[in-house]
């Protein structure tokens, strides 16, 4: 069994000398999103926008290729919880890499999925550091208007309450 000290030495060697393995990555899981934020860069009118998501098999191969220095992954998108397999994706990172923290950016429109994800990941690995960024741009009325979703602000608060 590899000790924490040995893992840290491997990461430090990679960061300062070899520089061949990532320490942190941002994985853009999907362009799909249930909001239509006025500032978003995703072109929802382009028919190719929602093509080319990586399959679980592709993500499995990808995570196995990342080496043993990965400490953090940021799962983002569109709305990462639009992918029903987000739990399996996170588990692949935990299983196939040395990731210690998972950071998820969400519009918090799907509180049930967010809560299920948090419970499943903590049950899978109690040592993983799990962080959520819930996007709130303004007071309730303006937040909902800009993101073109009614009750989204309230959903953000609901999601936060479930996670705390």
Can you annotate each of these PLM segments?
Residues 89, 142, 155-158:
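Residues within well-formed alpha-helices
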Residues 39-41, 143, 153:
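Aromatic side chains
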Residues 1-2, 161:
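Polar low-complexity intrinsically disordered regions
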Residues 147-164:
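Glycine-rich S-adenosyl-L-methionine
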Residues 104-105, 139, 160-164:
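Conserved strand-turn element in the central/C-terminal portion of the radical SAM core barrel
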Residues 2-130:
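Conserved alpha-helical substructure of the radical SAM core
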Residues 80, 108-112, 133-149:
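Conserved radical SAM core fold
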